[in-house]
A protein has these predicted regions:
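Detector for small/aliphatic-rich hydrophobic stretches
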Residues: 3-5, 10, 25-204
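Sec-dependent signal peptide hydrophobic core
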Residues: 10-17
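Hydrophobic core
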Residues: 18-22
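Non-catalytic, conformational "gating/processing" segments within enzyme and secreted inhibitor domains
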Residues: 50-53, 109-110, 114, 119, ...
């Protein structure tokens, strides 16, 4: 029974986390209450990113005192998010080395995209609501000694990647969906909200109304950018538990590309050559190369 249940959970887990918004222009939609909701996470409040143009006086002087006050408040909130316990990424690094090759190999010439952080959070939630051998297997994959350690590590990962200051939006949204045919412990739902910043819902699996709630949740968390993909996401009536994790990321380049330097060129793909626009920029930067690919670092603000 446990093996069958885990197969059902993982099948929907992998389908759900494939809906990922890596870059975005729209803003996340406002949350709406749902009759199905069991617990709702509270995201950190952040001071807004300082806009220098708002501190220029009519006579041309710059209000440095006012700017510094806003800047210091913003910097304190950013530091609060990024200053996580030393070594919290150790287990995450081990997980990434184990998982990424499995996710990105064997594409038969097709491009692949994945967000290992989303899968990490989904697996962490799954460990929270399972026990026995299933939990031990997940903890081993994630490199965590026990659930208490996993809670601390997952919360640190989530907070280190969270930002919502008006200039950068980076939100990992997580959720758990339960069948109304099974019982649950409210303290477990509260733990998901507290440590994994996850919403939890309970309803009739396979019903149009519950599917619509899932689709709406995906849309709200991704600024409506995945409306088409989310509209086809449904849960089978025999499903007991489903997990969904999205990432909404929006930021500016540290140095924007000049449109005048964008020119058509040849892109060499496995399927053949094609002509497309290439953004070009000159400068000193970090460059990585290997036998099979090369990459360049491009910082964001």
């Amino acid at each position: 029974m446990e093996v069958l249940l885990m197969k059902r959970i993982f099948a929907l887990l992998l389908a759900a986390v494939s809906l990922i918004s890596l870059t975005a222009c729209a803003q996340p939609e406002a949350k709406t209450a749902s009759k199905y909701q069991l617990a709702d996470p509270q995201y950190p409040q952040m001071a807004p990113y300082p806009d220098e143009t708002k501190f220029s006086r009519p006579n041309g002087d710059f209000d440095s005192d006012g700017f510094n006050q806003v800047y210091n408040a913003w910097q304190a909130d950013r530091r609060k998010q990024t200053d996580q316990p030393e070594g919290y990424t150790d287990a995450l690094d081990s997980y990434l080395h184990a998982v990424i090759p499995q996710l990105l190999t064997g594409g038969s010439g097709e491009n692949k995209v994945c967000s290992p952080i989303n899968i990490y959070m989904a697996l962490a939630m799954l460990a929270e609501v399972t026990d026995s051998e299933s939990r031990e297997q997940i903890l081993a994959l994630l490199g965590s000694g026990d659930v208490n350690a996993l809670r601390a590590e997952a919360a640190a990962v989530w907070n280190a990647n969270y930002c919502d200051d008006g200039a950068v939006t980076s939100i990992l949204a997580n959720s758990l969906w339960l069948s109304d045919k099974i019982s649950f412990k409210q303290e477990a739902m509260d733990a998901l909200a507290r440590y994994y910043y996850a919403s939890s819902f309970r309803g009739e699996m396979g019903s149009a109304a519950f599917d619509k709630t899932l689709q709406d949740w995906i849309g709200q968390q991704t600024g409506g950018l995945l409306k088409e993909q989310a509209s086809g996401l449904t849960m089978d009536k025999e499903t007991i538990l489903a997990l969904a994790s999205t990432i909404y990321f929006r930021a500016k380049w540290n140095g924007e590309f000049s449109e005048a330097n964008t020119v058509p060129d040849t892109f060499h793909a496995d399927s053949g050559d094609t002509t497309c626009d290439f953004m070009r920029q000159r400068g000193t930067n970090t460059y990585y190369w290997s036998d099979r690919f090369s990459a360049v670092s491009k910082p964001l603000e």
